């Protein structure tokens, strides 16, 4: 049963607790520094480009844990140190320099942390994982402070994770207990008036250091530069483990977050031209509007080493999220930016339960070395909604001189009801057959039983879809040398179809699952001082779009063809460059005449990103960084009547690491959207959001 109880932390109470250690350091640090100010501290900074990035492990679901170099699909991992250095505060900021990823969400609002990969928006309920297991992403900006890295698997993931968007999978990897005891605290500020306090502590204790812990606490509150909005967030993350024997480790992970935000109004354009972009600080939301999300997750897991070559794992997870919101949507009514303001008040609750067991190992049959994975998974998702969801128009205005109304009188009523239940059970197996040091073949299959039932307010079944499908994957890999992999891969998948948008005649109608196929050819290579990857892909996916009668339909097929390249280069001892580019064409085929041959919505024709990092040798500990992002044209609607203009964004920042009182202290500053560029971001067909304005983030961190 989804709980509607919301735990409330007072920001000032949590702030006092979190800042206690920081204030102690702040007062003691200068005194300690004065006692030894004749000796300059020795600072050693290791740039990420020095590391073998492609050799690091990424989670590959039913394929087990593999390095990026050994994975026959395109992948990307962003570690927590890079997230902290850039002061990234959202999933979109974490992944902005990966050209395959585009942002589909506002800074605030009811749908944060929504992204597309290869032009395909990820499924909020199946496309985002935590440690490879189910996660509720709808309406939730995950607390990045809780995670060691964020991984992107690009392309079809049906075999590896089950139902999901063919664009890919986002996987958050939680911070784990550390072998050495440590305590860190940091204080951050974002322009507009948002303050954040964060504590991170970890270590081990007990006989033979058998027990480990990692705890993160966050408090964030204040006004935001974007939308003239506000945020109030409290997050708690805890990870515990027990090494019960040399072969058996048991883990317990938990995350809680309460996040209240204002802003993030949707601008809906149909039948008129796209308005000129607005300044990102423009307030568009009414008095009384908000988004309140209460999120919690608990996972119990165990890993057991069966032998030197075999291991088993089992995990059970429960997560739930309650999202209550009152939001504005501006329906454009003229080519000069006039609009009607429609307010929706709604309750949404989600409850995920999942269990998974997996065995991985190696065997040899003759000249073949087999890397085997076997597993089973079961999960169910319950969704509840408000019985009466009012959506009145409360006024009119113009985007360039918006009128702020009151939405206090608009409130959902009648309690809540179960509106949908989705169940998946699956069996999966894969075999990576190594013929020699150069050639290997991967074959895998996943059998899924899928049931999706929608319900009316009278608790009767209004729609029901079932599927029993095999999701195969296959790949051939060739290693001309130990540091290079050339691969060809093929995969099929099913995804839960989108419901009809609320702006259509058949609002909220559900559809049968959609089938997708992907073929990919790529190469990955890693050397001292540089690494790179190149992939060519083709994705076929069943289409959903709004037709000329304003009815959302499932019809035809969307085809995506593209090439993406990524690389890192250590230009000098102190200067490094990361770059990424994707060029893609998309087309709707076998569909109604009005959309046949048109570009797929939300898929940019080109994207690029780059980061430059420079260590200042004259001042050890100082590192400068700059970034650039380009997003090309994309279609706002299936008929291609409106096309979003391309835009470029630039960022810059610095980090300075030094010792104060014997403790490493890091000072960080970062500015996003340096030129304060005005731009629109795509959310879904006909929906726009205002792009984020120039924002300054400051932070100081002390490690004990």
Which residue stretches match the model-derived regions?
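Conserved C-terminal beta-signal and adjacent last beta-strands/turns
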Residues: 6, 34, 372, 519, ...
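Extracytoplasmic beta-strand/coil segments of soluble accessory domains associated
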Residues: 54-68, 72-75, 80, 92-133, ...
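Short acidic/polar hinge/loop motifs at secondary-structure boundaries
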Residues: 133-156, 173-174
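Outer-membrane beta-barrel translocator/receptor signature
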Residues: 145-148, 159-236, 244-248, 296, ...
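Structural signature of Gram-negative outer-membrane beta-barrels, strongest in the C-terminal barrel
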Residues: 241-243, 350, 369-373, 377-381, ...
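Surface-exposed extracellular loop regions of Gram-negative outer-membrane beta-barrel proteins
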Residues: 260-274, 380-385, 451, 464, ...
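Membrane-embedded beta-barrel scaffold of Gram-negative outer-membrane proteins
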Residues: 301-317, 321-327, 486-487, 512-570, ...
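Gram-negative outer-membrane beta-barrel transporters
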Residues: 536-540, 554-638, 675-678, 701
């Amino acid at each position: 049963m989804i709980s509607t109880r919301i735990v409330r932390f007072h920001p000032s109470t949590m702030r006092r607790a979190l800042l206690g250690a920081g204030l102690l350091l702040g007062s003691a640090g200068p005194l300690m520094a004065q006692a030894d100010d004749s000796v300059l501290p020795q600072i050693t900074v290791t740039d990420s480009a020095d590391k073998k990035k492609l050799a690091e492990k990424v989670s590959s679901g039913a394929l087990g844990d593999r390095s990026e170099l050994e994975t026959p699909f395109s992948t990307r991992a962003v570690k927590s140190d890079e997230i902290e250095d850039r002061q990234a505060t959202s999933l979109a900021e974490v992944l902005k320099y990966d050209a395959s990823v585009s942002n589909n969400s506002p800074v605030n609002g009811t749908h944060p942390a929504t992204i597309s990969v290869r032009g395909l928006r990820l499924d909020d309920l199946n496309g985002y994982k935590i440690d490879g297991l189910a996660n509720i992403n709808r309406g939730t900006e995950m607390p990045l402070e809780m995670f060691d890295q964020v991984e992107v698997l690009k392309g079809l993931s049906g075999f590896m994770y089950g139902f999901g968007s063919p664009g890919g999978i986002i996987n958050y990897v939680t911070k784990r207990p550390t072998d050495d005891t440590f305590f860190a605290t940091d204080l951050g500020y974002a322009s507009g008036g948002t303050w954040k306090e964060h504590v991170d502590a970890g270590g081990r204790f007990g006989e033979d250091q058998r027990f480990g812990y990692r705890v993160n606490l966050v408090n964030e509150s204040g006004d935001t530069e974007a939308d003239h909005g506000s945020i109030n967030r409290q997050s708690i993350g805890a990870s515990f483990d027990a090494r019960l024997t040399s072969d058996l480790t048991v883990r317990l992970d938990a995350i809680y977050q309460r996040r209240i935000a204002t802003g993030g109004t949707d601008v809906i354009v149909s039948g008129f031209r796209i308005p000129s972009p607005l300044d990102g600080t423009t307030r568009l939301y009414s008095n009384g509007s908000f988004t309140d999300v209460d999120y919690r997750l608990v996972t119990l897991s165990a890993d057991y080493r069966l032998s030197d070559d075999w291991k088993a794992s089992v995990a059970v997870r429960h997560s739930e999220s309650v999202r209550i919101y009152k939001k504005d949507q501006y329906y454009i009514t003229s080519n000069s930016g006039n609009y009607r303001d429609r307010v929706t008040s709604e309750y949404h609750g989600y409850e995920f339960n999942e269990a998974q067991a997996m065995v991985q190992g190696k065997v040899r049959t003759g000249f073949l070395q087999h890397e085997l994975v076997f597993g089973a998974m079961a999960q169910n998702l319950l969704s509840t909604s408000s019985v009466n969801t009012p959506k009145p128009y409360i006024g009119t205005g113009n985007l360039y001189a918006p009128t702020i109304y009151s939405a206090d009188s608009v409130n959902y009523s009648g309690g809540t009801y179960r509106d949908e239940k989705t169940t998946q059970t699956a069996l999966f197996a894969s075999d990576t057959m190594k013929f020699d040091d150069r050639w290997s073949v991967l074959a895998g299959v996943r059998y899924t039983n899928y049931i999706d039932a929608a319900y009316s307010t009278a608790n009767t079944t209004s729609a029901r879809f079932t599927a029993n499908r095999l999701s195969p994957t296959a790949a051939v890999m060739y290693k001309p040398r130990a540091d290079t992999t050339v691969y060809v891969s093929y995969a099929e998948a099913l995804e839960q179809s989108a419901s009809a948008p609320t702006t259509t005649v058949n609002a909220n109608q559900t559809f049968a699952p959609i089938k997708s196929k992907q073929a990919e050819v790529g190469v990955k290579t890693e050397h001292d001082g540089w690494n790179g990857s190149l992939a060519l892909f083709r994705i076929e996916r069943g289409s959903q779009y709004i037709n000329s009668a304003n009815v959302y339909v499932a019809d035809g097929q969307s085809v995506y063809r593209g090439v993406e390249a990524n690389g890192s280069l250590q230009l000098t001892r102190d200067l490094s460059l990361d770059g990424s580019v994707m060029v893609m064409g998309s087309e709707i085929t076998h569909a109604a005449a009005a959309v046949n041959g048109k570009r797929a919505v939300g898929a940019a024709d080109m994207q690029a990103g780059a980061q430059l990092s420079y260590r200042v040798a004259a001042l050890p500990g100082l590192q400068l960084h700059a970034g650039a992002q380009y997003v090309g044209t994309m279609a706002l609607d299936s008929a291609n009547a409106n096309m979003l203009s391309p835009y470029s964004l630039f960022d810059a920042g610095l980090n300075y690491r030094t010792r104060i009182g014997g403790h490493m202290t890091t000072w960080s500053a970062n500015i996003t959207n340096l030129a304060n560029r005005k731009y629109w971001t795509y959310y879904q067909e006909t929906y726009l959001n205002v792009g984020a304005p120039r924002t300054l983030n400051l932070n100081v961190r002390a490690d004990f």
